[in-house]
UniProtKB/Swiss-Prot annotation:
Belongs to the UPF0145 family. This is UPF0145 protein AZOSEA16190. It comes from Aromatoleum aromaticum (strain DSM 19018 / LMG 30748 / EbN1) (Azoarcus sp. (strain EbN1)). Disulfide bonds: none annotated. SUPFAM superfamilies: YbjQ-like. NCBIfam families: PRK02877.1. InterPro entries: UPF0145_dom_sf, UPF0145_YbjQ-like.
């Protein structure tokens, strides 16, 4: 599945539009809370384990996006937008949401 943040795919022609599709993934409360605690503890550094968790959530959201587009008969998604949103009681969860337009390209 081709996915791009641009409204078109260079060298390809969009033959049909199938509608807006989305994918989401949520990182649970403990992971998000621990992530900030770890960042405070390693000022100026990076936390590989938390970056890996966030990367995994983003990949899950993109997999959901591709599946949604595929169910509509699309072979690409254009205009992809990636958002991160803090949710829940005491802002204890992080949602990664991706959306775009499912299309068929040649």
């Amino acid at each position: 599945m081709l996915m791009t943040t641009t409204p078109t795919i260079e060298g390809r022609t969009i033959r049909s539009y199938h509608g807006v599709v989305a994918g989401e993934a949520i990182i649970g409360a403990n992971v998000f809370k621990d992530m900030f605690a770890a960042v405070r503890d390693i000022v100026g550094g990076r936390s590989g384990s938390y970056e890996k968790t966030l990367r995994s959530a983003r990949e899950t959201a993109f997999e959901d996006l591709a599946e949604a587009a595929g169910r509509l008969g699309a072979n690409a998604v254009v205009g992809v937008d990636i958002d991160y949103e803090v949710l829940g009681e005491k802002n204890g969860m992080l949602m990664v949401a991706v959306s775009g337009t499912a299309v068929t390209v040649e």
